[in-house]
């Protein structure tokens, strides 16, 4: 079982996000510009799950890949997967919130495994749970560090604007900064996927 190192995940994730910044950023922008289009939006939502996988494999990202017809073929199965996760999260919330967070980390790889490995909904959830076993809190802290860093930078920018009595501008700047830093979040996911899935497969072959 691979054990994640929180600081290595953050550091390497930032490198991956930075090295692929514009391709990831353009992909995310393209996704949000077209997410309102019925039917197509399901395919692009499935495709966007592949983004961190491609980064983990070191592949070059072409933003228009999200429109490939192959992603729409498994629309029904994907909706089943997302539906199961959503219902379980809601139930977890009513059991004291903490189960919801545990499930979100345990199943964090499910959508990527669904797209990359062609697993069905239950297989993806089971495999994700197995792969993240013993690493859930490491994943949590890696995400927390990145999230806090992004919010801190955005908050400072918004605070400066507010101090200059440009409160509306401050909010706009805050959201823009958060959006601009999204590629680094994808980089973090890529390192987690690479460490827990791809490197594990390589070690098993050897």
Name each region found by the language model:
Residues 156-164:
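Juxtamembrane "helix-exit" motif on the non-cytosolic side of transmembrane helices
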Residues 2-33, 64-91, 103-156, 190, ...:
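Interfacial aromatic "cap" segments that immediately flank transmembrane helices
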Residues 31-61, 86-126, 165-201:
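Selective recognition of hydrophobic, aromatic-rich stretches within alpha-helical transmembrane segments
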């Amino acid at each position: 079982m691979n054990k994640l190192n929180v600081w290595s995940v953050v550091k390497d994730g930032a490198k991956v996000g930075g090295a692929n910044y514009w391709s990831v950023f353009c992909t995310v922008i393209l996704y949000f510009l077209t997410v309102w289009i019925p039917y197509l939006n399901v395919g692009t939502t499935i495709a966007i799950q592949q983004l961190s996988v491609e980064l983990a494999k070191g592949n070059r990202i072409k933003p228009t890949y999200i429109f490939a017809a192959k992603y729409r073929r498994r629309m029904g199965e994907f909706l089943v997967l997302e539906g199961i996760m959503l219902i379980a999260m809601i139930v977890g919330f009513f059991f004291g919130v903490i189960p919801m967070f545990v499930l979100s980390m345990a199943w964090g790889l499910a959508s990527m495994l669904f797209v990359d490995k062609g697993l069905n909904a239950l297989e993806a959830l089971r495999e994700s749970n197995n792969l993240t076993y013993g690493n859930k809190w490491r994943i949590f802290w890696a995400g927390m560090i990145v999230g806090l860093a992004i919010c801190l930078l955005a908050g400072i920018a918004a605070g400066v604007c507010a101090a200059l009595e440009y409160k509306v501008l401050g909010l706009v700047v805050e959201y823009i900064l958060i959006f601009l830093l999204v590629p680094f979040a994808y980089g973090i996911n890529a390192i987690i996927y690479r460490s827990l899935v791809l490197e594990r497969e390589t070690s098993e072959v050897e």
